């Protein structure tokens, strides 16, 4: 076999699954001027968070009566504030057509999958399958800036300090029995019952099921630096003393 044949068989790429933390911006109104002003305030509070942040624009909750959305201008507003649009979530034909014209991926609207999967009435009652139980992932060494630790299908327990710039991800709960200065994202697949437990809250960001608070918000909390328990109530993160 010649060298050219060997090179032809040598793979030049691999497709790998990856769990990425991506911010979803859910628009409630088609008002780009107000959006620009409110984003300016948010960026002033947390400039590091708005630095080349990947974004999904959720347009499926926009009221029908507010007119056609200028998607290109919306993306330009986001770009000016450091938000990089990767895809949109939409149901209106105009929004979908605009995205396709820009070669921008379109995700199904929130709840569409659940509606499609509504089962027909069953003649025979079936016992639901037992959920697969995965053991907690336990980390005993410090998690340093730039590192990412993910507990798939379960809880993440960290027994050492978490530095600024580090990221903890879990499908379930996150426990940090040491100073917590990085990011903690629990329930990343939508588990709204997930919790975060910190022995010393000094985090850059705390998030449960996509609802988050950044350091600028957390520092104003009277429990900053204390042992806390974080839970989700509706769309609001509740922080209480442990």
Swiss-Prot record:
Gene3D superfamilies assigned to the protein according to its UniProt record, in alphabetical order: 2.160.20.70, 3.30.70.260
Keyword Cell division in annotation: yes
Keywords: Cell cycle, Cell division, Septation
Pfam families: MinC_C, MinC_N
Coiled coil regions, renumbered to chain: none
Region (Disordered): 120-144
Biased composition, class Basic and acidic residues, residue ranges: 120-135
Keyword Cell cycle: yes
GO BP: cell morphogenesis; division septum assembly; regulation of cell division; regulation of cell septum assembly
InterPro entries recorded: CAP/MinC_C, MinC, MinC_C_sf, MinC_N, Septum_form_inhib_MinC_C
Task performed by this protein: Cell division inhibitor that blocks the formation of polar Z ring septums. Rapidly oscillates between the poles of the cell to destabilize FtsZ filaments that have formed before they mature into polar Z rings. Prevents FtsZ polymerization.
Quaternary assembly: Interacts with MinD and FtsZ.
Family indicated by similarity: Belongs to the MinC family.
Protein name in UniProt: Probable septum site-determining protein MinC
């Amino acid at each position: 076999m010649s060298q050219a044949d060997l090179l032809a068989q040598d793979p030049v790429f691999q497709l790998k699954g990856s769990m990425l933390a991506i911010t979803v911006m859910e628009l409630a109104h088609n008002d780009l001027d107000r959006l620009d002003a409110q984003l300016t305030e948010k960026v002033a509070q947390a400039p590091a968070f708005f630095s080349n942040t990947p974004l999904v624009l959720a347009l499926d909750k926009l009221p029908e009566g507010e007119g056609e959305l200028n998607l290109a201008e919306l993306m330009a507003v986001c770009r000016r504030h450091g938000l990089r649009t990767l895809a949109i979530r939409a149901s209106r034909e105009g929004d979908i057509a605009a995205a396709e014209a820009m070669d921008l991926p379109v995700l199904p609207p929130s709840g569409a999958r659940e509606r499609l999967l509504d089962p027909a009435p069953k003649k025979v009652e079936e016992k639901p399958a037992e959920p697969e139980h995965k053991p907690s992932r336990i980390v005993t060494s410090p998690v340093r800036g730039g590192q990412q630790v993910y507990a798939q299908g379960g809880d993440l327990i960290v027994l050492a300090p978490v530095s600024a710039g580090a990221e903890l991800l879990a499908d379930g709960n996150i426990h940090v029995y040491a100073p917590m200065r990085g990011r903690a994202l629990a329930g990343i697949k939508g588990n709204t019952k997930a919790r975060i437990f910190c022995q010393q809250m000094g985090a850059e960001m705390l998030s449960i099921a996509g609802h988050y608070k950044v350091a600028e918000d957390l520092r104003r909390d009277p429990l900053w630096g204390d042992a806390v328990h974080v839970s989700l109530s509706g769309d609001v993160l509740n922080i209480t003393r442990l």
